[in-house]
Every structure is written in structure tokens, then in C-alpha cells.
Amino acid sequence: MLSELFSDALALIKQYKRIIIHRHNYPDGDALGSQKGLEALLKDNFPDKEVYVVGDEATRLPFMEQRMDEIPDEYYSDALAVILDCGSTRMICDDRYKTAAKTLRFDHHIYAEKVADLDIVDSTFESACGLIAMFARECKLKLSPTSATALYTGMVTDSGRFVFDSTSARTFELAAFLMSQPIDLNNLYYNLYAEDFSEIIKDADNMHRIKFTKNNVAYIYTAREDLPTNGDAAPVVSTGLVGLMRDIKGVFVWVNFTESEDCVHCELRSNRYNINPIAVKYGGGGHKKASGCTVPNRAAAMKLLEELDALAAAAAASATPATNN
């Protein structure tokens, strides 16, 4: 099935001289890696094509040096828009993709809705970068160090350094395929995970803010007035804080709440149970064990927390952990 979809995608790519690559707002390593990786892949294999990348400026991973292109609206009328790492239309940065001649999506979230003319969605992949890597391998496309490094970055970040459940034998096969190119792993991991001492102190302070529900759901709530003043947007802060609760012994569900100007950003996580239906109920989505949503206020956030607590209680009572993804 994937082989056929990859062939269809390659045919679409060959058909259009201009290709514009989109991804989700507030990009993480997988969004940026898939965007930069696909951009390099297309430029390496189709040097006569115009390839552009669009979206909000990335602040979380400056070492990736992924600049965004500013292009006029009229570029879309005869272009193929490629959408990466987006489980729904609300996630897509820059809605001009709707005016493109044709659209193509590569994604690894749980399927929620049709987004593109050709949707390639497989939630068994650990990352959108892994899906692009397999596309490159199956279609026998030329791979450069730039493309390989970007795609590897997304694979390692979205798999939690190859720890999360979505990591599979295929993950390592594709990582090995990418490592056929000279990736500087020491430099990559340093840029991804080394922190200034001041940031480590902040992490320690934030850990002191962790609270627990009756059934041991860990959570942090950050009010808008308590947001850091370094310019990071609330979704970026929220994603960073949720990871602090990942390795607490005896905690199987955790959530971070971060207020912004008009909503509360919620990052839901579990290492055992399917929390996705709760995120979907509140208008979000993602994966079985890693999902997100936004709610209008603190009261709604606390209601969501109650539902996570009830899930943890029911799951503990039945003692039947969920399976992968």
C-alpha cells in the first residue's frame, strides 16, 4: 500500500515545476526536520524545480538554520503544496496551501480528516521524518548529508532518542539508511540536548511546581503572568515543560497546561494508556500516548485533568495497559 502511495507522490512531484512545503505551527524537530529534509531531497534530485519552504519562524532549534521563504500568493496557482507532520487542517501553518493546484501530505498522526488531494498517513511511524526517509529509500532518490541529517534529527526527537513505543525495527533500518551519509552525531546530539546551566536551574525550579492528582496524574499549570520572558510562545513552553514529568516512577499519565492570551495549551502524555480520545474530545489530537489540545480557560483545563485522573483510576483498576502508539 505504501509503495503505491509513494509512487503516486513521486508522480505528483515530477508533474509540478514549483513545490511549496508546509508544516505545523510552532515547529518541533520532526516538523523542521521533515521540511528541511524534503526540501534538500527535492533540490538534490530535481535541480530544475523551484522548491520553497513556508511557515512561522522556528525558535526552538536555531542550530537547524531553517530559514523560511517569503513568496507571493500567486505562486500557489500552479504549484504542488506538500504538507508535513500535520494531523489536521488546524495545525497547518500558512493556509495558502488551500489555493495550490494540488496538495500532498506526509503524516504520522492518527488519521482524523482528509487534508490533501493525496494523503500519505501512517501512525505506525515514529515520525514524519521516518516516513520521508522511507519515501526516499523506496523511490531510490539520491540522499545528501543535508537531507539525511535533517531527517535523522526528526526521527531522534520524535522517538525520544529511540525510546518511545513507536520505535520499531523499521525505525532503526531507516536510521541506518540515513547514516549511510556522513551525519555528525556528536554535534547533532550536543545541539539537541546540551543546556545552559541557567536552563537546568529553571528545569529544577519547574520540577518543584509539579503536582499530582488523587490517582497520580502529574501536572504543571503555568499562568500567563508566570510565562518566561525570553520570547518563547506558550506552545513552545508547554512542550518543553511536559517532558520534565516523563520519568517519574509510578506516574503513567501526565499533562502540562500553559496559558496564552486567549486559551490554555494542553500537552497530554502517557507511557501506558491511550489518552488520545480525551484530547480529541477537547478539539485536539495526535497519538495514542502523546496528544495535545487547547481549551478556553483554567476551569476547562481542570475538567480535562479530572478526565485524565478518571482514566488513570480506571486503567489501574483493570491493570491492562494499552499497546503501541
Spans of features found by a protein language model:
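An acidic intrinsically disordered interaction segment
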Residues: 1-7, 90-92, 96-103, 123-132
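Hydrophobic helix-and-loop "lid/oligomerization" segment in the mid-to-C-terminal part
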Residues: 2-25, 29-62, 73-78, 157-325
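Glycine-rich, phosphate-binding/catalytic loops in enzymes
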Residues: 37-39, 98-101, 121-122, 173
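Conserved beta-strand segments of alpha/beta enzyme cores
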Residues: 50-52, 102, 119, 142
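Structural signal for conserved beta-strand scaffold positions within catalytic alpha/beta enzyme cores
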Residues: 53, 83, 105, 120-122, ...
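Membrane-interfacial amphipathic helices and adjacent loop/beta segments
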Residues: 58-69, 132
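Active-site cofactor/cluster-binding pocket
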Residues: 65-118
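Short alpha-helices
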Residues: 109-174
